[in-house]
Amino acid sequence: MAKESSFDIVSKVEFPEVQNAIQMTLKEIGTRYDFKGSKSDVTLEKEELVLISDDEFKLNQLKDVLSGKLIKRDVPTKNIEYGKIENASGGTVRQRAKLVQGIDKDNAKKINAVIKNSGLKVKSQIQDDQVRVTGKNKDDLQQIIAAVRGADLPIDVQFINFR
């Protein structure tokens, strides 16, 4: 009997990279002319980003700068869920953004559906916040990786532990 191969599908955000992107964003808004004299700031509190600025327009500009820096640092921007804009102290506005870690049940079911629709002889099982895919043929597993990458999922996924 041939040995089965497997890999895990996960969704992770590297927090040191997020911190680096925040530092680069703060450095850029400190030197930009349109942010001179404004109270714009980005902080990381546990698994949540907090963006503060003078008004909604500057907050959206801050978000654009942050997104660009996150993309340069290979942090998936699909895994950021922005909350609503709220008023903060001192006439500023604040927006919280949750960094999504792991694959929830709904997204795991979507990934399983993509795997089942491929028609390949592989098994997939949901394990907490990841999906494990096993099969006898490594080529089938590589086709599954291509199918999941090509699927339009609401979160960004990574593939680890390919054995």
From Swiss-Prot:
Q: What GO cellular-component annotations does this UniProt entry give?
A: cytosol
Matches recorded under InterPro entries: DUF520, UPF0234-like_C, UPF0234_N, YajQ-like_sf
Q: Alphabetically list the UniProt keywords.
A: Nucleotide-binding
**UniProt cross-references to Pfam families, sorted A to Z:** DUF520
Name any one GO molecular function.
nucleotide binding
Among Gene3D superfamilies, the record links this protein to: 3.30.70.860, YajQ-like, domain 2
Give the protein family. Answer: Belongs to the YajQ family.
Q: What does this protein do?
A: Nucleotide-binding protein.
Please identify the protein, giving its name as recorded: Nucleotide-binding protein RBAM_011030
